[in-house]
Amino acid sequence: MRVVVGIDDTDSHRGGCTTYVGYLLAKEVLRRWGAGAFRDFPRLVRLNPNVPFKTRGNAAVALDLEIPEGDVEELWRLAVETVAAHSRREGKTDPGVAMAAGGVPERAKTLYRMALTQVVSISAAERAGVLTWGGRGKIGAVAAVGAYFPKSTFELIAYRRGDREAIPPDLVRLLEALTYPYTFHNVDRRRVLIEPRGPDPVYYGIRGLTPQHLRYALSLLEAWGYRPAGWVIYRTNQATDAHIELGVFYGDPLPYSFYRARGLVVEARRVAGRHLVGRLDSGLRFVAYRHLGRLASELERCLRCDVVLYGGLKPRRGGLYLYVERAYVLGRYIPARSRCTYCGGSLESLGRGRGWRCRRCGAVFHSAPIRWLYDTAPRRALLPRPGEWRHLLKPPDVDPTIPNFFSPSSAEWIG
């Protein structure tokens, strides 16, 4: 029988990691039911990063399994016991578990689409038609059960025992040179991106498109002495634009949702800290942080540009602000003087208050209003520097259809 188990919210700001609990659960499933129980790689499901209840990256984990029907209750007990034993119950942490047996309900799939962009209630998760346990974490757990990946990437997550030893940037650049574009987002200038900076048990995480290239990257780091205590390859919706292609968008801006807004930039100015604050002609205000790099600097020069902005909506100073994560410039409105209505010739001024005269036919006009021309030459995408990419953002050089050709039987995926 097909059974999908989801877990979420097992970590806190002081430690822990939901992917690590998923790794431990996957090891137990392997021990009891063998590798044949896995219909797919374990899934790392990124959700709306703007919700105020998240710990760090707002990720849930799911296992898509095939086990005997009589073992379903045993699997449920195993999942609940594993989460309960390894959760960090501190601060906002409120772990949850969800399970669907025999098939995934459509309501769970809909909840996944909502959780990519919106704030979802616990009651909505409880009505999704799957078995649940725990607190607020059941929202992400149900979303992970309902997650489906038309496009995907992989991430090899290695776990540490003891202190995290820093990996030199030069070694990470070598790793990327040997594996790019089949691994990506490894280093940004001198900043190593594969190592987290928090107190969680993750040693490093390498994103890629094939399990084989990820295993090669792992062996390269091991050869240089950076050996993890354990590792697992997750299939994930990272770097796929899943929130844009599958997420639910509402017409009205809602707090803590991921939002898409099109409009004319009528204001863009730097404030304290060199952050950019601006406004669209609709009245929606937006913010682009200085450390976004080219995205903020180019958006500053986009006055009178027709743009599409993507980002998270957050309350600020009594209103909602869109915190920009990416932008698309569709065109710019350029002022141009009206031409002669008789012959189409250009007009010259006769002096202040005296009107305008056609250079070609001599016709005189009392006024020459400005015409606005729409220029599509500036059309381009504005992306942040790699170190500031959100997890779901798809880099322009990544093909998230490649991972669809791989299954757990095609490569070693856990160790």
Curated annotation (Swiss-Prot):
One of its GO terms (cellular component) is cytoplasm. Keywords: ATP-binding, Cytoplasm, Ligase, Nucleotide-binding, tRNA processing. It is found in: Cytoplasm. It comes from the Archaea. Its EC number is 6.3.4.22. One of its GO terms (biological process) is tRNA wobble cytosine modification. Belongs to the TiaS family. ATP-dependent agmatine transferase that catalyzes the formation of 2-agmatinylcytidine (agm2C) at the wobble position (C34) of tRNA(Ile2), converting the codon specificity from AUG to AUA. This is tRNA(Ile2) 2-agmatinylcytidine synthetase TiaS.
